[in-house]
Amino acid sequence: MGQTIKEIKARLADLTDLSAKEFLEFETDERAGVQAALKSRKKQILAECAEDERLEQMLEFEKELYSQEIELIAGIDEVGRGPLAGPVVTAAVILPKNCKIRGLNDSKKVPKSKHHAILSEIQEKALAIGVGIVDAEKIDEVNIYEATKIAMIQAVSKLSLKPEHLLIDAMVLDLPIAQTKIIHGDARSASIAAASIVAKVTRDEMMKDFALEFPEYDFEHNAGYGTAKHLAALTKYGITRIHRKSYEPIKSMVNFK
């Protein structure tokens, strides 16, 4: 008696190589259900191979350092330089050697629905994680660029392990640690991408909490960015303690110098 479609699907699920003899074996099965299962599994394997290749490319900078016997590599990234309200949040993440996390990418390229699952895997696998937070008052005092650097240095200081090298998205920090500045690093380095996810989820959760305190501004949806609803609330209710007075249109509203 031949195998049922359910049994064939179970066998296909175990295959990871398109050259496996089972694919040839099932090609001759004319049942529509078998052919659909074959097509689906082949598509999955191709997608998995493409993802493996992408993740391998995201270890390019890390592998260069591994070749120099440097393994404690901290990726650093920020979230929240552009919003009108809320803090700038940074993260530093040290991943184990050759760590691959499926779906890991620049947080802006990862569907929000997957942020928490990827964060959980980062937290499970990372050797160390540090987070830095600088509030709106400090941003107004020193400017967003300097505030971001302060937050990044905070994040590094909170790591439980001392990194041997820093991979940073487009910045250089005043720290006695070797560094590599990488443009668009959050999409090119696994370590920086991990930091971007940690920083993004941390900041989003903070903005949800601020939304409970200031419900009129829709912070849980706009994360402090200047959406139409947020700008309308500013006009109607004025600014809050978490608004950045050095950012327009708030700067003009309060005559910030």
From Swiss-Prot:
It catalyses: Endonucleolytic cleavage to 5'-phosphomonoester. A divalent metal cation binds at residues 77-78, 169. Manganese or magnesium. Binds 1 divalent metal ion per monomer in the absence of substrate. May bind a second metal ion after substrate binding. Its main location: cytoplasm. GO terms for cellular component: cytoplasm; ribonuclease H2 complex. Coiled coil: none annotated. Residues 71-257 form the RNase H type-2 domain. Its cofactor is Mn(2+); Mg(2+). It is found in: Cytoplasm. Endonuclease that specifically degrades the RNA of RNA-DNA hybrids. Belongs to the RNase HII family. This is Ribonuclease HII.
